[in-house]
């Protein structure tokens, strides 16, 4: 949610409320399970989302990698197949998928950094593995390998609304 807001995009208040409620519930459960946990520092990891700004060798990327015809978040949302059981139970969450884009724009080594549910991780990997080639990053006018971390949100209400819109558009065409 914070990432979406930082990009200047809108997010439903309900989605923010659901995410905050889930985080509070998780914190409450963690406190019950381990009452002294707050005394020990806990590192969960903070991942920067989007393209890495430097190459593996440390050079500053001048032109970031991108999909040619569509924003990567729009592509992911359009390709998403929500796990049926999780959709039925209104389970929301996310997956963070990191991958490398090679000099030809081919995705290499996609892997999950973090996810709230194994099925969300599987779906995020499927989406990334099926992506078309990217326009690679450039340094000094030459294509270079670069890393990208994609945040894939799973919001059941939003997904259901998008399905309804698609169904209406399809029925208009027929």
Each model region followed by its residue ranges:
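Charge-biased low-complexity segments
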Residues: 1-174
């Amino acid at each position: 949610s914070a990432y979406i807001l930082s990009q200047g995009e809108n997010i439903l208040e309900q989605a923010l409320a659901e995410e905050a409620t889930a985080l509070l519930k998780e914190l409450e459960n963690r406190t019950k399970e381990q009452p002294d946990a707050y005394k020990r520092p806990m590192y969960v990891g903070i991942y920067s989302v989007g393209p890495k700004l430097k190459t593996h060798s440390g050079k500053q990327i001048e032109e970031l990698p991108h999909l040619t015809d569509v924003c990567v978040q729009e592509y992911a949302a359009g390709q998403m197949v929500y796990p049926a059981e999780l959709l039925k139970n209104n389970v929301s969450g996310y997956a963070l998928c990191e991958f490398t884009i090679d000099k030809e724009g081919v995705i290499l080594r996609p892997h999950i950094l973090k996810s709230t549910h194994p099925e969300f991780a599987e779906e995020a990997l499927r989406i990334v593995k099926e992506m078309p080639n990217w326009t690679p990053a450039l340094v000094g006018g030459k294509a270079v390998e670069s890393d990208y971390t994609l945040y894939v949100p799973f919001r059941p209400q939003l997904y259901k609304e998008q399905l309804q819109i698609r169904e209406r558009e399809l029925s208009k065409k027929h």
